[in-house]
Every structure is written in structure tokens, then in C-alpha cells.
């Protein structure tokens, strides 16, 4: 095995998906703690400490306690290199989340044991299913009251349409939480709460059929043994291939806050989740062990660091290796660039990178030339597929409070649109600026970021736009004819693409009927 193949085999790149408040930020911290990437796991939102989770770094996130933007963290664990991507937990951020999930090889689903499967989890699982992403499940908050675990597994199967195979099983919950039993290997892991940055020593009781186990479970012993018989009779057994195919999820129980069970999940990712996988490009399939470098940009993030007014493009490496100072071809522009200052992300700490391999996520400084979906190679013209833009569902007209700041407004919106935080449209017949979003919160985010980062205050006005469609037409003459007739509703988006802003559903249906040669697209691949 070459050194490069060995490095790729060590990589595990995964994202955490959950409904807001299921404990995603806490679990992120505890995972980093396992990899010793942060020394103090600050309890998020706690009154005792004002330390915020390092992955929730933007002002607005700090106020609302939701991770609005994906951040990337790399840390070592058991001779492996883990790349952890945090996804926005709020329902308004489906585009950003979708694109993040195109950059990973597996996902960790965190469920609140008291609530079970929630709407946001369902939406994220739908996205994972599009790519058959393997899912590891963690049922969290066993230090509180939870629903019946068998009921929770049934719900995962019924609602998320995936087989659930419990690997560990909880012994009690809330004040009676005594630990978990490992179903396949017949041992008990005793619960001792470890808060903050404490990593408690694990106490193991070998064999359920032992005096020590009987003493630990006390009066609950007989009932627990009966429950286990039921579980083992009714539940699926773990099957590696079904997991890799995205048809079965191994389920673990624990409490991230009490620092218990998180290591079981990380072990599962290392032992079972796939190493970096091959990627489909328009031209061919790219294997991770190929010598030549290739990668695609799945996210652009403005102002990650108030100290540096900058934009960072996040790139997933698909093949080869990155070496500091190497020359790459920016395929869309057909330009060669030398990249000497790529970054890796150790939580919110940035470090200059010397080398990186397939599966790693690196950050490139972006001075406005890089767009989402861009491919970088060592010369080959490749375009990776499946990184879409979605048509927004909500629209607002932007009104400036200070008319002298229109230049800053345009610049700010252009940058925010580039990173996928919003979509911006410039109608051909007016000087209006129209914003499109997938959820209402996105408008708040844009307004607060314009104010914080670009010193521009704006207000929103309602506008009669039902939906946007990207226009495509092979017949130049027909396209010109269409542009003349439909000019009242035509706009150009932030990337310069012609867009039809349909005032109503009926109008769109009529236009599609009237112009059969014109394609009205609801999604647009990033070219």
C-alpha cells in the first residue's frame, strides 16, 4: 500500500445531523475532546460558564444557540484522522446543509431520547437518502427522562424508513441511569457522569450473567434480562454491508452532557464507516487513491474571523494530495493558481496546512473568484456533479435605510449570495434588489450580517414573486423572443444567470405551456 493509500484509509469524513436542541453542539465538543482537539469542553448555553461551543462562531449563532453555518473540525483519534462537519441545525438552512452533506462519506444522527424523531431530522435524512449515506445513530439525553427505547427504535424504522440495529442498550434513565449493555459482546459499561472536560475512566462489567452485573442492576436485573430477550428477538442485527448501503443504522445510547457513550459512536465511525469514497464527475469517476489532486468547493464562508476580513472556500479533496505551494487548475476559469496558504480547521483555530489527502476538507482564501461547485485539479478538466442550487421559496425586496450605501449593499449581498447564505436577483426592468431564501430566518441572518460585517442597514418589503426558475434554451432566436416578451419578470441572479421570477403558480404554468422550447429549471447545478 502506498503512503497515499495508507493516509486515505485513515480518513473518516462525516457530518452530524439533528433537530435543533437534540444536543448536537455538546456532542461536537465531546468528540473534539476525544481527539483532544479542545482542552475544555465548555458547556454550551450553561449559566455557569460563558464559554460558547467553538463550532458556533458567528454572532447570531451565539445569540440563538443554533449552528447557522457549517464549520469543519479535524482531529486525530485511534490512528485515524477524523474530519467532522457541523451542519446548520435550523430548518431554514437546507441548501447549506444539503451541500455539506455532499462533502461527507457518512453521517451521525443525534436524537433527543425524550422527543425521538423530529421534523428537521426527517428532512436531513431525506437528503442523506439521495446519496445512500451510511448513518450511525446516537440517542442522547439518557441523564433525563426518555421515551421507551423500543418505541424509539420503532419510530426510527417507521418514520425514517431505515432498519435500526441497537448496538448498546440503556440500563434505566434519568436518576436511575446505570449505563449501557453491549448486545453483541455481552458486557456492561457503567455510567459515571463526566462533565465539561473530564474524561472519566470507563468501568466495564464482563457478562450480564455475573454476580457483579446482578449487584450493579439490583432489583432491576430480572426486568432488564426480560427486556433484552424481547429486544434481541424483535430487532435487526447489525450488518456491515447494509450499513454501508445506507439501509441500516447502528444505534447507540448515552448522554453527551454527561460525557457518556460518545466514544462508542466515534469507535463505530472508525470501525465501520467508509473511508473516502470515489466521486462522480461529468467526465469519469475519480478514485481517492489516484495520484493527481482533485477537489470541489461545497461552501463559501465570509468573515470567519472578525480579525481577518476574509472569505474562505471550503474544499473537499477527492483524490491525490495537497502540498503547500502546489499549482492547481481552477477548472471553471481555466486558470492555474498557486495555493500556498490553504488552511485546516482545528475547531475554530486555523492552521496553515503542509499537506492533506482525499477526504480532508481544506480552506482556500477566496478573493471573489471562487464559487460553490468549482473544481480544482492538477490540469484535468473535471466537473464534480451533484452540488445544486435550489429555487428559493420566499422573496423580499431590499430597501436601504441610507441610500448612499448602495455600493456596500450590492457588494455585501453579492458576497453573501456567493457563499449560499441567500440568493440575490437583479430585475432587468428596475433598480430593485430582490432576495430569495428557503426559510424566513435566512432574511434575518442576511440583515444582521449586513449590519455587522458591512455596516449597511436594510429593511425588507413584501413582493409578489411566487417562485424563481433558471432559464435555459438551446435556440438563440427563441431565447431572444422570450426575453423580449417576458422582460417584466426577468432578472439576473448573483452568478449572472438569467432567471424568471414568476408572480404566481398559474403564471408559471402558462409560461411553460407558451414557451415549450424554453426550460424553466427549479434547480441549477453549480457550474
Curated annotation (Swiss-Prot):
It comes from the Bacteria. It comes from Pseudomonas syringae pv. syringae (strain B728a). GO terms for biological process: regulation of translational termination. InterPro entries: EF-G-like_DII, EFG_III/V, G_TR_CS, P-loop_NTPase, PrfC, RF3_C, RF3_dom_3_sf, RF3_GTP-bd. It holds the Pfam family RF3_C. Gene3D superfamilies: P-loop containing nucleotide triphosphate hydrolases, Peptide chain release factor 3, domain III. Residues 9-277 form the tr-type G domain. This is Peptide chain release factor 3. GTP binds at residues 18-25, 86-90, 140-143. Belongs to the TRAFAC class translation factor GTPase superfamily. Classic translation factor GTPase family. PrfC subfamily. GO terms for molecular function: GTP binding; GTPase activity; guanosine tetraphosphate binding; translation release factor activity, codon nonspecific; translation release factor activity, codon specific. SUPFAM superfamilies: EF-G C-terminal domain-like, P-loop containing nucleoside triphosphate hydrolases, Translation proteins. The keyword Nucleotide-binding applies.
Amino acid at each position: 500500500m502506498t503512503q497515499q493509500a495508507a493516509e486515505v484509509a485513515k480518513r473518516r469524513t462525516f457530518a452530524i445531523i439533528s433537530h435543533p436542541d437534540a444536543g448536537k453542539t455538546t456532542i461536537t465538543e465531546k468528540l473534539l475532546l476525544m481527539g483532544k482537539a479542545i482542552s475544555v469542553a465548555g458547556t454550551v448555553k450553561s449559566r455557569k460558564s460563558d464559554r460558547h461551543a467553538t463550532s458556533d462562531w458567528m454572532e447570531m449563532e451565539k445569540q440563538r444557540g443554533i449552528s447557522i453555518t457549517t464549520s469543519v473540525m479535524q482531529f486525530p483519534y485511534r490512528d485515524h484522522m477524523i474530519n467532522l462537519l457541523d451542519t446548520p441545525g435550523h430548518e431554514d438552512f437546507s441548501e447549506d446543509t444539503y451541500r455539506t452533506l455532499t462533502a461527507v462519506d457518512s453521517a451521525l444522527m443525534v436524537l433527543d431520547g425524550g422527543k425521538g424523531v423530529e421534523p428537521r431530522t426527517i428532512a436531513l435524512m431525506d437528503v442523506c437518502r439521495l446519496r445512500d449515506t451510511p448513518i450511525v445513530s446516537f440517542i442522547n439525553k439518557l441523564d433525563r427522562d426518555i421515551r421507551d427505547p423500543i418505541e424509539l427504535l420503532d419510530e426510527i424504522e417507521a418514520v425514517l424508513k431505515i432498519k435500526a440495529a441497537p448496538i448498546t442498550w440503556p440500563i434505566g434513565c434519568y436518576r436511575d441511569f446505570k449505563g449501557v449493555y453491549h448486545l453483541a459482546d455481552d458486557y456492561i459499561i457503567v455510567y459515571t457522569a463526566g462533565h465539561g472536560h473530564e474524561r472519566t475512566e470507563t468501568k466495564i462489567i464482563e457478562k450480564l450473567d455475573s454476580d457483579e452485573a446482578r449487584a450493579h442492576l439490583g432489583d432491576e436485573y430480572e426486568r432488564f434480562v426480560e427486556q433484552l430477550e424481547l429486544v434481541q428477538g424483535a430487532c435487526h442485527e447489525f450488518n456491515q454491508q447494509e450499513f454501508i448501503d445506507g439501509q441500516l443504522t447502528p444505534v447507540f445510547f448515552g448522554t453527551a452532557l454527561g460525557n457518556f457513550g460518545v466514544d462508542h459512536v466515534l469507535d463505530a465511525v472508525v470501525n465501520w464507516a467508509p473511508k473516502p469514497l470515489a466521486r462522480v464527475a461529468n467526465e469519469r469517476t475519480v478514485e481517492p487513491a489516484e495520484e493527481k489532486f482533485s477537489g470541489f468547493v461545497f461552501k463559501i464562508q465570509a468573515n470567519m474571523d472578525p480579525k481577518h476580513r476574509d472569505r474562505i472556500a471550503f474544499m473537499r479533496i477527492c483524490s491525490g494530495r495537497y502540498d503547500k505551494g502546489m499549482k492547481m487548475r481552477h477548472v471553471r476559469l481555466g486558470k492555474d493558481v498557486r495555493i500556498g496558504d490553504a488552511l485546516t480547521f482545528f475547531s475554530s483555530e486555523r492552521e496553515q496546512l503542509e499537506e492533506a489527502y482525499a477526504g480532508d476538507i481544506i480552506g482556500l482564501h477566496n478573493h471573489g473568484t471562487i464559487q460553490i461547485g468549482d473544481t480544482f485539479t492538477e490540469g484535468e478538466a473535471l466537473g464534480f456533479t451533484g452540488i445544486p442550487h435550489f429555487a428559493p421559496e420566499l422573496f423580499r425586496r431590499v430597501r436601504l435605510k441610507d441610500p448612499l450605501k448602495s455600493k456596500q449593499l450590492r457588494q455585501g449581498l453579492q458576497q453573501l449570495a456567493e457563499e449560499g447564505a441567500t440568493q440575490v436577483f437583479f430585475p432587468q426592468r428596475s433598480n430593485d434588489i430582490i432576495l430569495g431564501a428557503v426559510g424566513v430566518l435566512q432574511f434575518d441572518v442576511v440583515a444582521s450580517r449586513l449590519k455587522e460585517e458591512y455596516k449597511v442597514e436594510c429593511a425588507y418589503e413584501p413582493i409578489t414573486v411566487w417562485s424563481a426558475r433558471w432559464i435555459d434554451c438551446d435556440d438563440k432566436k427563441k431565447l431572444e423572443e422570450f426575453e423580449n416578451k417576458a422582460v417584466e419578470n426577468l432578472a439576473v441572479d448573483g452568478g449572472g444567470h438569467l432567471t424568471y421570477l414568476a408572480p404566481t403558480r398559474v403564471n408559471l404554468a402558462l409560461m411553460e405551456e407558451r414557451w415549450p422550447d424554453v426550460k424553466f429549471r427549479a434547480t441549477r447545478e453549480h457550474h
